[in-house]
Swiss-Prot record:
The lineage of its organism: Bacteria, Bacillati, Bacillota, Bacilli, Lactobacillales. Belongs to the class-I aminoacyl-tRNA synthetase family. Glutamate--tRNA ligase type 1 subfamily. Disulfide bonds: none annotated. Keywords: Aminoacyl-tRNA synthetase, ATP-binding, Cytoplasm, Ligase, Nucleotide-binding, Protein biosynthesis. One of its GO terms (biological process) is glutamyl-tRNA aminoacylation. NCBIfam families: gltX_bact. ATP binds at residue 258. The gene is gltX. This is Glutamate--tRNA ligase. Its main location: cytoplasm. One of its GO terms (molecular function) is zinc ion binding. The keyword ATP-binding applies. A motif ('HIGH' region) lies at residues 11-21. A motif ('KMSKS' region) lies at residues 255-259. It catalyses: tRNA(Glu) + L-glutamate + ATP = L-glutamyl-tRNA(Glu) + AMP + diphosphate.
Length: 483
């Protein structure tokens, strides 16, 4: 690539950072960093009706949390918000008007709706019908004067050559082309309130900021021919376009929807639940791209080095919540304890469980956690009531050898002084119980685990027993023996 790589992520401050938008930002970031280019943040805030207070700060904060940095943004550069660039848009709108490539349109929303209703009834795709078609200059002047007298504010439309072919070689999908007659006719580049439309402003911005590549979701494919109309009208070279496939829900097979309740879809949600940012970064990077091979855990540096835009998938990317939870567990298991402890601290404090056992409990459950907030549920045994046993657990306790195992193990535990109730002293008692009862393996460990903790699965049993404390464990064993 000879041209300087410059890519952008251009969110609208209309809400929280969604997984799909985070992927767009991440792929642009990896592409820029891999090629030694620039990653730019631009805020597209011309949709004033949907503008959310603090939306911009939220977007940037969540991108930072994920581990991304950028070279240019509204924080460091002037006029990187579309609302600050209105004079620039007006300059090019005036140019197109002066060159006869755009014009004022006075059709009202009601008239446009009526046109579309007729087209729909006739089975014709909706498109704008030029209101000046067939008018003489005098008729056109009279029409405009009449509309002005009615205080109808015009929009500005750009002229579309319906016979032209708008095509590009897409980085992901290969060659794509649209006929000019299939993009809806002359379209609005400036709204009645004076603000530019998205498809016009984005072209001016990308040209002005010397964007070399536009990498975005394939829901933007239909926007691309409209943007090429503007590039052609202004005599500018278009950037290279790449349209990533959509993200689907792995359980439904349908496009990921904000209404899907089986997935968390906003980065803020993952932060609140105590997921590790590196895990989310890793997971999102593999949604629609893969370096090949079986490896799935990658550092940011590895992803930058391996990223290859030619390996972007042409098939939809499946968002699998269980896979993400598995990946976060891998990161938590292998993270420094101090980092994991800090991650769990707010949840322990909120649950009133940040006591002298907190560090040992986090250490105990670190290998099991899929997110830091799970520490509260995992430690319920130490602070709440004894859990309700499953049918399978009850069957295990009903085994013929269980009473002998539990009573023998209980007797040996009871002999340990409180001061010696440690993992080092508890561990040998299992071997001693096996030797005395002749019971071994699952039939030895499982009844003790169920009786002591109420669960068939969990962290290391000697550590669990030591942290529960002598009094509580003996009480649990007595309860199991007396059933």
């Amino acid at each position: 690539m000879n041209k300087k790589i410059r890519v952008r992520y251009a969110p609208s401050p209309t809400g929280l950072l969604h997984i799909g938008n985070a992927r767009t930002a991440l792929f642009n970031y990896l592409f820029a960093r891999h090629h030694g280019g620039d990653f730019i943040i631009r805020i597209e805030d011309t949709d004033r009706e949907r503008h959310v207070e603090d939306g911009e700060r939220s977007q940037l904060e969540n991108l930072r949390w994920l581990g991304m940095d950028w070279d240019e943004s509204p924080e460091t550069h002037e006029n990187y918000r579309q609302s600050e660039r209105l004079p620039l848009y007006q300059k090019y709108i005036d140019q197109l008007l002066a060159e006869g490539k755009a014009y004022y349109s006075y059709k009202t929303p009601e008239e446009l709706e009526a046109d579309h209703a007729k087209q729909e009834a006739a089975g014709i795709p909706p498109h704008y019908i030029n209101e000046y078609a067939g008018m003489s200059d005098d008729e056109k002047a009279a029409y405009i004067a009449e509309r002005k007298a009615q205080n109808i504010e015009p929009v500005v439309r750009i002229s579309v050559d319906e016979k032209a072919i708008y095509k590009w070689n897409d980085i992901v999908k290969g060659e794509i082309e649209f006929e000019g007659g299939n993009i809806g006719g002359d379209w609005v580049i400036q709204k009645r309130d004076g603000y530019p439309t998205y498809n016009f402003a984005v072209v001016v911005d990308d040209h002005d900021m010397q964007i070399s590549h536009v990498i975005r979701g394939d829901d933007h494919i239909a926007n691309t021919p409209k943007q090429l109309v503007v590039y052609n009208a202004l005599g500018w070279e278009a950037p290279q376009f790449g349209h990533m496939t959509l993200i689907i829900n792995s359980e439904t097979g349908k496009k990921l929807s904000k209404r899907d309740t089986n997935t968390l879809q906003f980065i803020e949600d993952y932060r609140k639940k105590g997921y590790m940012s590196d895990a989310i970064f890793n997971f999102i990077a593999l949604l629609g791209w893969n370096p090949g091979g079986e490896k799935e855990i990658f550092s940011c540096e590895e992803l930058i080095e391996l990223f290859d835009e030619n390996r972007l998938s042409k098939s939809p990317a499946a968002f699998d919540q269980k896979k993400l939870d598995w990946m976060d567990n891998e990161y938590i298991k292998n993270a420094d304890f101090a980092k994991v402890f800090e991650l769990t601290k707010p949840f322990l404090v909120a649950a009133n469980r940040f006591d002298e056992r907190a560090k040992e409990l986090v250490k105990l459950y670190q290998p099991q956690m899929k997110s830091a907030d799970e520490i509260v549920e995992l430690t319920e045994l130490f602070y709440g009531d004894f859990p309700e046993l499953t049918d399978e657990a009850r069957e295990m306790l009903a085994a013929e050898t269980t009473p002998l195992v539990l009573s023998t193990f209980r007797a040996k535990l009871a002999e340990l002084p409180e001061s010696d109730f440690t993992v080092e002293n508890i561990f040998p008692l299992f071997k001693a119980t096996q030797k005395e009862t002749g019971v071994k393996g699952k039939m030895l460990w499982m009844p003790i685990r169920i009786a002591a903790s109420g669960s068939m699965h969990g962290p290391e049993l000697p550590e669990t027993i030591a942290l529960l404390g002598k009094e509580k464990v003996l009480a649990h064993l007595d309860a199991a023996l007396n059933k």
